[in-house]
């Protein structure tokens, strides 16, 4: 449902904005908060575009859904790149777009989003700015450092597997309900035609 997706995106965008500015102005951690806020602003603009250009549609097409979920992955990856990469505890949220897709989109689109998410995880593992201070004073053990992306990959695969399983069952039930509704609709039409024919015969 488009409205549900829009609302979830607003929750994410507002959460990002509050977190970035709380870390910068309340905790006084040092990082590029201006660029981080611009990335959040980009996310807000994409959501406004979703509201404006798709206002007459209750459901997004497969293609449109993929583009917006790709934007979500890109936007969050950029934020994580600015704030520590996979060491950032919020990196777990990178899994959400793909999991959301597994419930609502077809297998091909979901696999493509899993690949994009995996590439994003790999990139921000090796290329990123330092985690906002004062945590920069702590030197991470290299085994701990690399265990985080490994855990993310494992979670990505298993969560998507379970989500795909439940999503498939949900789609099967939905198709069955739609077929039942079609049959009932046709029966109503036949009853209506039969009534009209009987009325015509008696007239």
Name each model feature, range by range.
Residues 1-11:
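N-terminal membrane topogenic signal
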Residues 11-85, 94-97, 117-118:
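Hydrophobic transmembrane alpha-helices and their membrane-interface boundaries in multi-pass
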Residues 15-20, 68-89, 107-143:
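Hydrophobic transmembrane alpha-helices
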Residues 35-40, 141-152:
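Alpha-helical transmembrane segments of polytopic membrane proteins
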Residues 49-54, 147-184:
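Juxtamembrane or sensor-core-proximal signal-transducing alpha helices
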Residues 56-62, 102-114:
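Membrane-helix interface "capping/anchor" motifs
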Residues 91-98, 155:
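Hydrophobic core segments of transmembrane alpha-helices in multi-pass, intramembrane catalytic enzymes
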Residues 173-203:
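Conserved HAMP-HisKA connector
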């Amino acid at each position: 449902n488009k409205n549900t997706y829009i609302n979830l995106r607003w929750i994410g965008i507002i959460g990002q904005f509050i977190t970035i500015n709380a870390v910068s102005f309340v905790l006084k951690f040092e990082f590029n908060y201006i660029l981080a806020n611009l990335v959040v602003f980009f996310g807000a603009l994409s959501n406004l575009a979703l509201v404006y250009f798709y206002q007459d549609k209750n459901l997004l097409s497969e293609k449109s859904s993929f583009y917006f979920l790709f934007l979500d992955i890109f936007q969050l990856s950029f934020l994580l790149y600015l704030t520590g990469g996979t060491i950032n505890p919020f990196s777990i949220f990178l899994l959400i777009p793909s999991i959301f897709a597994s419930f609502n989109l077809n297998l091909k689109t979901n696999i493509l989003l899993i690949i994009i998410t995996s590439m994003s995880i790999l990139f921000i593992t090796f290329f990123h700015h330092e985690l906002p201070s004062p945590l920069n004073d702590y030197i991470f053990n290299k085994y701990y450092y690399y265990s985080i992306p490994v855990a993310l990959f494992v979670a990505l695969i298993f969560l998507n597997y379970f989500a795909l399983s439940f999503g498939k069952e949900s789609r099967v039930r939905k198709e069955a309900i739609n077929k039942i509704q079609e049959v009932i609709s046709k029966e109503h039409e036949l009853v209506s035609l039969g009534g009209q024919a009987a009325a015509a015969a008696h007239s």
